Amino acid sequence: MALSNTLSLSSSKSLVQSHLLHNPLPQPRFSLFPTTQHGRRHPISAVHAAEPSKTAVKQGKWSLDSWKTKKALQLPEYPDEKELESVLKTLEMNPPLVFAGEARSLEEKLGEAALGKAFLLQGGDCAESFKEFNANNIRDTFRILLQMSVVLMFGGQVPVIKVGRMAGQFAKPRSDPLEEINGVKLPSYKGDNINGDTFDEKSRIPDPHRLIRAYMQSAATLNLLRAFATGGYAAMQRVTEWNLDFVENCEQGDRYQELAHRVDEALGFMAAAGLTVDHPIMSTTDFWTSHECLLLPYEQALTREDSTSGLFYDCSAHMVWVGERTRQLDGAHVEFLRGVANPLGIKVSQKMDPNELIKLIDILNPANKPGRITVIVRMGAENMRVKLSHLVRAVRGAGQIVTWVCDPMHGNTIKAPCGLKTRAFDSILAEVRAFFDVHEQEGSHPGGIHLEMTGQNVTECIGGSRTVTYDDLGSRYHTHCDPRLNASQSLELSFIVAERLRRRRMSTQRL
């Protein structure tokens, strides 16, 4: 397919370059073994991560269980401690779910995002469940993340780092330890790896054997994701065809048609240059997993010492984050996380004091290593415009390197007239726009977006071009916790973000 103008040719070339950068040929995708490097090491930078250096510990000696000396919030109370210990010993003997080299590779990519040279797309279920576990659901979420990543990559002309809230995102913090229905109070549902969502006394008792089931489900999910990422399902041509189909069947498809067809033209150029669908660059992709580091006994049981660096990695996921409710400076969760070498996320709301954020980053990343810390901001559009700039200035003033990411979901949860929790697409979009506006104002880099979403055609968030109304919520409301964007809403959001990335890129090029 011939390209008709210089802009298309330039975009095509940039897409090739960014795809090559994101998928270097010599390194196998989703390697089952730690990544090894040969020759002279690169110095630490946001682009090239050096050989991992041991984390400096300022608050006493760290150990795998030093978190037990701190106050631990949001942890369940198991009725039989001996049974819990038996389960944890079994997990300690099981193979790791991910490897240190994979986590280091992700950290290097996130370091690029901190400098505006890459963009993080992190998404998946609010909470994975045993009941909804099947290959089709995993495939559909992976597919929509692929579609979104291609759109974002073309808009920003930078690599897109794909990280799923998958293969371990079970446990959920709760604001109230008890749930009341019709005058009956029971312990709150905390996620399928802790207790059951059925409202009866037996289901709500924490069961340690659920940890084994969660581990097995995570392993199966990872196995399928690896197959999808390397087996041809992620082929660029296939993903582009899916996006073109979305545009043709979308009520507001005209808004996105130009970008979708430019991507298609770029693929024509790449094919003419020899990058056909059979080329590994065009048929495989990198993909990482993440979840909230909440259930510390489980995380400790899956932490392993890396033989190549001597560092400890939480091998339950490539990336883990500390939540808004568990990020206390002197708390157990921060104590555990400061000693593992994975890239870490920090969830931040409007309640975060700038000085507290600086202290927290210093505890978790005293060496100021690029890619180590991702600050995931969740506060609603109005608070974003008022509060985020203070956080950005404080972190920059302290000389700290972080990747700024927008979570437009958690600050926009409302209750519908029918009683179900929902989120409005327009509110989500408003927070994303506020995030970009603040970074444009501050001269900092918007490093990514973090979404609760699914590849299913659910009706949990209202709005979007294929409008979901309050009346529609009950028809396909399947979430076990918070409302998620459906496939159409997720892809629509990615087109809007891609256009914002394109505008940012064009304005930067003119400077």
Swiss-Prot record:
Keywords for this protein: Amino-acid biosynthesis, Aromatic amino acid biosynthesis, Chloroplast, Plastid, Transferase, Transit peptide
Tissue specificity: Leaves, stems, tuber and roots.
Secretion signal, residue range per the UniProt entry: none
Pathway of action: Metabolic intermediate biosynthesis; chorismate biosynthesis; chorismate from D-erythrose 4-phosphate and phosphoenolpyruvate: step 1/7
UniProt EC number: 2.5.1.54
Transit peptide among keywords: yes
Induction (UniProt): By glyphosate, wounding and fungal elicitor.
A biological process term (GO) from this entry: chorismate biosynthetic process
Domain of life: Eukaryota
Molecular functions (GO terms): 3-deoxy-7-phosphoheptulonate synthase activity
Subcellular location, record wording: Plastid, Chloroplast
GO cellular component: chloroplast
Catalyzed reaction equations: D-erythrose 4-phosphate + phosphoenolpyruvate + H2O = 7-phospho-2-dehydro-3-deoxy-D-arabino-heptonate + phosphate
Enzyme class: transferase
Coiled-coil region(s): none
Family: Belongs to the class-II DAHP synthase family.
Matches recorded under PANTHER family: PHOSPHO-2-DEHYDRO-3-DEOXYHEPTONATE ALDOLASE 1, 2 (PTHR21337), PHOSPHO-2-DEHYDRO-3-DEOXYHEPTONATE ALDOLASE 1, CHLOROPLASTIC (PTHR21337:SF24)
UniProt protein name: Phospho-2-dehydro-3-deoxyheptonate aldolase 2, chloroplastic
Organism phylogeny: Eukaryota, Viridiplantae, Streptophyta, Embryophyta, Tracheophyta
Gene expressing this chain: SHKB
